[in-house]
Amino acid sequence: MGAVTKRITLDELRQLAARARGNIDKIYLHWSASNYHQFFSDYHLNIDNDGAVMATTDDLTEYKAHTWRRNSRAIGIALACCVDAVAYADGRIDFGNVPPTELQIDSMAKVVAVLCEELGLDINADTVMTHAEAADLDDYGPATTFERWDLWKLPDVPGDGELKPGGQVIRGKAIWWHNNW
């Protein structure tokens, strides 16, 4: 399918993931630093502001350049948002005029739950991580140079609404979805 972007359902995603089982070890979560409705073929899946899942491939094992030195045997998923987001060294974040929506965050968690179930992966920080978490491991994230801080922090909604580590928010929701289908 190449760079053609197609809206898919979670059932269709299950089918794609089942075909990729045994060939994927990691899932990396991003935002695209773009506007809503703007999708990029660097990611296998893009999620729009209304939670719609957009696939840029019909083969989840296709190599995509989404995370520096971490693209082999990996799936990249991006929220279409945060075109003008700014992070500050003191931990404050301004998501700008195109913030991640509650629908996007929840949809990403559902996507992670489906993928992990079909791929046979545990939902944990070793198999599912944000770009910020991966970048910190490789010395270009929020802990060092702030080059990549995608999903570093996210509002915990519908929880207390406070900013919390984004990976924990999404993995926590994904575990909930996995246990409550």
Regions found by a protein language model. Give the residues of each.
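Basic/polar, cationic surfaces and motifs that engage anionic cell-wall
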Residues: M1-R21, C82-W181
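N-terminal catalytic cores of peptidoglycan-degrading enzymes
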Residues: M1-N71, N179
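Structural preference for beta-strand elements that scaffold enzyme active sites
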Residues: K26, A74-G76, T127-M129
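Peptidoglycan-targeting cell-wall enzymes and recognition modules
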Residues: N46-L103
